[in-house]
Regions:
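Conserved RecA-like P-loop NTPase ATPase core
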Residues: 13, 29, 69, 83, ...
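Charged, amphipathic alpha-helical linker segments immediately N-terminal to NTP-binding catalytic cores
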Residues: 1-2
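Phosphate-binding/switch region of NTP-binding enzymes
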Residues: 148-232
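Conserved P-loop
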Residues: 22-100
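Conserved catalytic network of the ASCE P-loop NTPase/AAA+ motor domain
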Residues: 19-21, 47-51, 76-78, 103-107, ...
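P-loop NTPase motor core
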Residues: 88-93, 98-183
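Flexible glycine-/small-residue-rich
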Residues: 59, 87, 116, 196, ...
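Pre-Walker A adenine-sensing motif
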Residues: 8-20
């Protein structure tokens, strides 16, 4: 049986991923607001559905709109035929969905996107919930996804909000990293950072972790555009 590879519909990012997101792989996408995180993983979910495989989009931000789905899918019925959207209201509900992934995968789920993995986690932090408790639970959720990805070939795409990096010698001003950086990077097989690139609509994708990266040196970088119909 051929390995399932889910394309992003963006040639530049597919190049970074080696053709698309492969089954059994966890991808972390992070970047500031407006860099295209949601659009990227939504395109992957729609492509998976359009290929005839079940896809789940977990909308933790609660701002995914039907109009955006129609614009990206071009109104093609097959693009949404196998797509399910879940909207957890809090971090506990996010945990429940993730704990159900093995059941979903055994029933044919091929791809899950969680947008964002850290939004509801951050909301709990703002309420004064113990960071230790939240970090332990976030790590557990990531471990569950890694196990399901390995055992069932589930392709996973996570997005994360960002925070300013703590200053280090030689660090440029304004550098950011994913919220819960250590946890998410540990479990992710591939990490892509999205950045604004100066021109209107132009964005930059930087591969920070992946099988093709070894040793020090410049990271692979590609440019793409955000349009009404998605990223290209």
């Amino acid at each position: 049986m051929r390995e399932l590879v889910i394309p992003t519909s963006c040639t530049a990012i597919d190049e970074l991923l080696g053709g698309g997101l492969k089954e059994g792989t966890i991808l972390l996408v992070y970047g500031a607001a407006g860099t295209g995180k949601t659009t990227l993983v939504l395109q992957m979910a729609l492509n998976c559905s359009g290929m005839g495989h079940k896809a789940l989009f977990v909308d933790c931000e609660g701002d995914l709109r039907a109009e955006r789905i129609r614009a990206i899918s071009g109104g093609e019925p097959t693009a949404v035929e196998n797509l399910t959207i879940a909207r957890p209201r809090d971090f506990e509900e996010q945990s429940t969905i993730i704990d159900s992934l093995e059941q979903f995968a055994s029933a044919g789920l091929a791809f899950v996107a969680i947008d964002t993995m850290t939004g509801l986690y951050r909301a709990e932090l703002s309420k004064g919930v113990s960071p230790f408790k939240l970090n332990r639970e976030l790590n557990r959720q990531a471990a569950v996804m890694a196990e399901v990805a390995r055992d069932y070939g589930l392709a996973v795409a996570l997005t994360s909000q960002v925070r300013a990096k703590i200053g280090k010698p030689g660090q440029e001003a304004g550098e950011v990293e994913p919220v819960a950086n250590r946890i998410l990077r540990y479990w992710a097989d591939m990490v892509i950072c999205l950045r604004h690139a100066g021109q209107r609509g132009l964005r930059m994708a930087i591969l920070e972790k992946g099988p093709s990266l070894s040793g020090p040196g410049p990271r692979a970088t590609r440019f793409f555009r955000i349009t009404e119909g998605g990223i290209v």
